[in-house]
Amino acid sequence: MTCPCAHSRFRWLRQFCSMLCVLVGCCSVPTRGAQDLDKPLLNIDEDITAFAYAPDGRIVYSVHRNFKTKLYDLEHDDIWLQEAGGKRRRLLEGQKFNRGNLPFSYIVNSFRWSPNGRMILAELLTTTVIDDSGKTQDSFQTLLLDDGGKEIRIAKGDSVIPDAADPFFLSDNLSINCLAEAVKPRMLFSLKATRLNTGSFQSPHEGRTFRDLLPLPGANSAIAVEQDHSQTGPSRLQRLDLLSDEHQELATLDGYEGGLSVSPSGKKVAYFIDKEILEVRDLASPDHLARLRIGLGVFHWSPDESRILLKRSLEKKSGDLVWIDLPPLSAVTLGHAVPVSQPSAISILHGLTFRDFAISPDGRFLAVVITGKRSLLVFPLPQR
């Protein structure tokens, strides 16, 4: 609210008003940050279901679309590409995307780019009608597209990998690894592999089960949280060579609640050991770690890895965004208690809530999906 006396022609009245406002906090002046929220660098005014930055800063995103058939109301997301110069191209018209004779709906859950920035892996959550009674079956599938919208057919076959979640390319831009459900629903996963030119093949880590797995940037290896199939033993942090069966156990975890994330340099890893505490660990010296009490949420690393940007809610749920400074990692002796810090949370974007967010690869921009209509907005990355 702007003070009614702020524009008075009497200087003494303006000064008195200013002093009174400071004392009682009754009036405020719009801040630069508020103006910035009204003027994003980019506004994609659509119902966004997922998005991801390409290595060069382009954005692939999916848009919620419904259409009717004679028997069913179906959902088939469109997929679009936002070019750096401002141009937008539709890569996939969802209504025209079909497989087999059974009706199905899908939403895009996530995207992953190839290292060369030319191919896109779209993880689809599908619901298929499997009989005349209307019984349905849910599954994960991965669709392969190039950045021109052409479907990429594996070994001249289909462009869809069935039963494939959290897919990613290896550094050769040819091999793909993904997760298949080993214990439903999404409790444990096995690793499956395919190549664009030859098709699927047995993973070197066949028979092992994982709670989570992420590739290391620029390497043919991954960090995984392994759990035995019976789920009776502890979770173990492993480094896997994805081209062989070689592996290195990094640590036995006190707990695992999700959120596995590898830092941009590939030198650190972070994850929640329970619903409150985040553990950050050095991958070169796994006994060097830190614990922070920040509450369960979704986070991304700052470019310099000195802090994280945390959305204080679960994935696909709305929450506010806060910066969390990371403490130095220190050596911890096995069997000794690990100290837990309680860092301050620095709110950004006026504490508004967002459904999804991502930091651009160059660390300059922040993309957010707003709560409600779910438009995609891009701002300069707020520092504080």
PLM-predicted stretches and their roles:
Residues R14-C17, P361-D362:
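Short, surface-exposed loop and linker segments with low hydrophobicity and enrichment for Pro/Ser/Thr
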Residues F16-G25:
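Bacterial N-terminal signal peptides
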